[in-house]
Regions:
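Bacterial N-terminal signal peptides
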Residues: 6-16
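Short hydrophobic alpha-helices and adjacent helix-cap/hinge residues
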Residues: 4, 17-212
Length: 212
């Protein structure tokens, strides 16, 4: 497992595809981009098409799938997502890019069989993850009791993670400098996994650095 800057994503993709060309395998290389949520948000849509166009210039095709993990109600629905991908892509993609840890938690079993040894890049990776699929689907706030180090989910796989720092303390500090008499801070978010985790980051930053 490697932890690297988001800026070298394309170098990593090229690096994972190079061995295929070196072995003289089929030139029909395909990168599959799986979004833990969907591609409706402008940044996600822009991200995919940027990847798509950059790869297309190199003769590599790219496809996208939305996993809609926040909408999954139970393990049966999660298994249905995995079964859909297994049927739709019986021939393993050359590489997989996963936007967000939740998608990896739901789909990692694909890399035990039909997609075994396929290199995967997980963006927006966190240090601690839900201890089980059930914890993820419950939307429960993560604690020491119901979470594990991310390495527990990633060990043994051909996986590279890209971490995203959210600068909670730095953002609050900037606001505090602009509004020195600020007494309350409102953080507006939704019920997605990453939003819950970011709320925790903001809460911790306030309690640790701005106790007053």
């Amino acid at each position: 497992m490697r932890i690297i800057s988001f800026l070298v994503l394309f170098l990593i993709i090229e690096g994972t595809l190079s061995p295929v060309s070196a072995r003289g395998e089929s030139s029909n290389k395909e990168v599959l981009v799986l979004n833990s949520i969907n591609f409706n948000l402008p940044w996600a849509k822009h991200f995919y098409w940027y990847v798509h166009d950059a790869l297309q210039e190199k003769g590599i095709s790219a496809k996208a799938e939305s996993l809609s993990v926040p909408a999954l109600a139970n393990e049966m629905e999660a298994n249905a997502v995995v079964d859909h991908l297994r049927r739709k892509y019986p021939v393993p993609p050359t590489a997989v890019v996963l936007i967000g840890d939740p998608g990896w938690i739901v789909c990692h079993e694909l890399f035990d069989d039909v997609w075994k040894d396929v290199p995967v890049i997980v963006t927006n990776a966190r240090d601690r993850l839900p201890a089980s699929l059930d914890v993820l689907l419950s939307h429960a706030p993560l604690t020491e009791a119901n979470s594990v180090p991310g390495e527990e989910w990633r060990r043994g796989y051909n996986i590279t993670i890209l971490k995203q720092h959210y600068y909670a303390k730095e953002t609050i500090d900037m606001i505090y400098q602009l509004i020195p008499d600020m007494e309350r801070l409102a953080f507006i978010s939704d019920d997605r996994y990453i939003s819950e985790e970011t709320r925790g980051d903001v809460r911790e930053a306030v309690e640790k650095n701005f106790p007053d």
